[in-house]
Amino acid sequence: MRLNIGHIKGQELERPMPSAIVRNLERRAAQEAVDAAVAVLDLNFEQLADTLQVDRRTVYRYRKRQTVPTPEVRRRFDMLREIIQLLEEIFAKPEDRHEWMYRSVPLLRGRRPIDLMLKAELEPIVEILAGYQAGAHI
């Protein structure tokens, strides 16, 4: 991440953002993603740990902003945030989002999205939701 420090003769000057600031931003992003997963997807910490492929205690530390996610976990958080955003855009009611997550979906060969999520298989869920958002039949 880079920090814009001004302009000289139309050129933007940048310097690397201090690592402490980056770590704080990453901790906050992880905490917000945990909160969103609990609120929107109704996941508990154990389910979220399975989704992120981390220990349940690590999820607790993310929630308390005590640790920075690894690059791989950040990637999973990114996909999880995308799933949450797409679900909120596609399904207006929380109960409709919940029903979709827990029912068999033909495009997932009859599997339930929650089952894929708990195995950290997030890409197919993102792809299907993005297709729905683009106008594919639900």
Predicted regions and their residues:
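Non-transmembrane "mature" sequence context
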Residues: 1-138
